Curated annotation (Swiss-Prot):
Source organism: Glycine max
Any Gene Ontology CC annotation: cytosol
Region (Disordered): 1-21, 771-807
Entry keyword Iron-sulfur: no
Phylogenetic lineage: Eukaryota, Viridiplantae, Streptophyta, Embryophyta, Tracheophyta
Composition bias type Basic and acidic residues, residue spans: 8-21
Protein name: Cell division cycle protein 48 homolog
Function of the molecule: Probably functions in cell division and growth processes.
Subcellular location: Cell membrane
Family indicated by similarity: Belongs to the AAA ATPase family.
Amino acid sequence: MSQQGESSDPKSGKKDFSTAILERKKSPNRLVVDEAVNDDNSVVTMHPQTMEKLQLFRGDTILIKGKKRKDTICIALADENCEEPKIRMNKVVRSNLRVRLGDVVSVHQCPDVKYGKRVHILPIDDTIEGVTGNLFDAFLKPYFLEAYRPVRKGDLFLVRGGMRSVEFKVVETDPGEYCVVAPDTEIFCEGEPLKREDEERLDEVGYDDVGGVRKQMAQIRELVELPLRHPQLFKSIGVKPPKGILLYGPPGSGKTLIARAVANETGAFFFCINGPEIMSKLAGESESNLRKAFEEAEKNAPSIIFIDEIDSIAPKREKTHGEVERRIVSQLLTLMDGLKSRAHVIVIGATNRPNSIDPALRRFGRFDREIDIGVPDEVGRLEVLRIHTKNMKLSDDVDLERIAKDTHGYVGADLAALCTEAALQCIREKMDVIDLEDETIDAEVLNSMAVTNEHFQTALGTSNPSALRETVVEVPNVSWEDIGGLENVKRELQETVQYPVEHPEKFEKFGMSPSKGVLFYGPPGCGKTLLAKAIANECQANFISVKGPELLTMWFGESEANVREIFDKARQSAPCVLFFDELDSIATQRGSSVGDAGGAADRVLNQLLTEMDGMSAKKTVFIIGATNRPDIIDPALLRPGRLDQLIYIPLPDEDSRHQIFKACLRKSPIAKNVDLRALARHTQGFSGADITEICQRACKYAIRENIEKDIERERKSRENPEAMDEDTVDDEVAEIKAAHFEESMKFARRSVSDADIRKYQAFAQTLQQSRGFGSEFRFPESGDRTTTGSDPFAASAGGADEDDLYS
């Protein structure tokens, strides 16, 4: 069971202690839950040796402790067939303990269980629909007669009788928490049937329900459980236990859930303060609310105070203008670490803006530990998906690992939304057999429902990570087939963007980080933006499109902040492709922009430079820029490490033009006599956009002709209805004919002049020259000792016979 911790880091001989608290302790009274053979609600069976180890005898009453601080009491019997560290119990006992098969429970002796004087037992309302007759005679009497069953207050148990099985709940027992129902015990079953409380109620979140934060969970448990359960540990070493934890991370990553789980599993008193609620209009009222909360918690120690959205009540004091906020911050500071020490009270704060909290709160003694609950990685996402789908009916073809791979940048909440969406998709398919008017739905319809892989794929298409909600880009459905020509450009792009996402281990093996930037340049209308769309669609990364000019705002310092935010978002939902269209609007050469908004463009460019290759670590964020004025872009952007791959996208040649015609007309019906090759030959110097325009225009003519024919036919049929019947036969197929293309070619025009093309080619050539510097370089042969001739500058240094200054 504790294998995970030891093998967590095989390379170093040292054991990783950071998650030590999560490991199961070995002790003889911890047993693994197994399915029962005989179905009795009050009996659990163990191997005789296990019984001997625990000093139990056949028929002893034992107390079993399960998850979420639930326990129940049962009678222990020996069973030779049960394996050693296992305990067999049926479904009723398991649900009372909130455990599943394979979980671990602890068994304790429970010697002095009294015979009960009276017990109060009520049925659960949804199991007794249509049951007639006296419940007591039919169900309870045969169940308890001569059986001496132990019961625990709050337990549910299932009784089979006649044709039905009914669930009952033990509402009250006298004496105390548990007792044995003997023949002289009075059983009350008067009263309204109980409503079933949801077994998985929200306030019953356990550690099992939090996935993807294993390391953080371990840290939180050391900080919370150790001081609350064993304060003497810290006393014996002589340090004060930590008292505050600040959880921060993007919204939806499970901060509040973790706090709930901790409170439930430790059994501490849980006091929740929602930031904005303690504000009040009366002076001094808000502070006293805070004081009351802390006093309440100290009365009920050990306790946990959870302050959600702490940035709303403890902002930086310099920045706030209101007097009230400052007083509240001061009050919080003194409460958390004032002269009066607080014992056994742990404060957990949660926020997604840790930098807007007053810095005095973030020192040791107040919030000692700051735990970053980030976006989960692939393993974490798989855990979260398993948790959300554990109660769903999944068909066999659902591949959760695959889904976890495809959901880059999703946090827990997004994965929950994904599962819900998949289930809804499943329900929508069955809507034709579900009638909303009916009272009940057929059982076979309900049983036939299962969520398939297809439903998940549909849901994946409609959902996106919440970090990207405001910069959301509908991932365009452009694939590589839509792009005619440009074969080698496509290949380079795939290598730049798809390899690092799909084969990260290769890069690690060769010890290099992949290049992160590409700049497309070339005449307008050649498919630069289209390429970026295709790569966003083909590679499973998230895609943020940034239009250059919209980053600039009128406020000072705001434009740079926009750049920073975009990069932050991209990092949160990595791997991510950032596409800057019209890059020249924000990346002009510095110093050239005189007088525009106090040089805002220059500052934006500086921010861009530092974000792309500054001190902060880049995760897998790819930057693709597109521009048709490469000559005015600041050279600092074009150095390797920022936009290191400069790809010139030229006007298409004849083959590419043929491909573009094909790609444009993929879905259109074309007459047999249209020769696309001839069209491609005649459109020398046209860009991709011009070619698309030719196709659109030809389409327009075809549609016009078609509509005119329809009108003509209707008129004829009105004039003489008899002739209509023969006429419908020779209705020709609607298609784009050669005549339409000829008509369309009359209006065709080139959007890029020759002078422009020459400019682009000159720029491309200068880049080629600066690039091809070491084309003569060869490694010297191993036998060849003389390497003097390999220096290209030595020959041009004007003969070596002159005295060289530097020799």
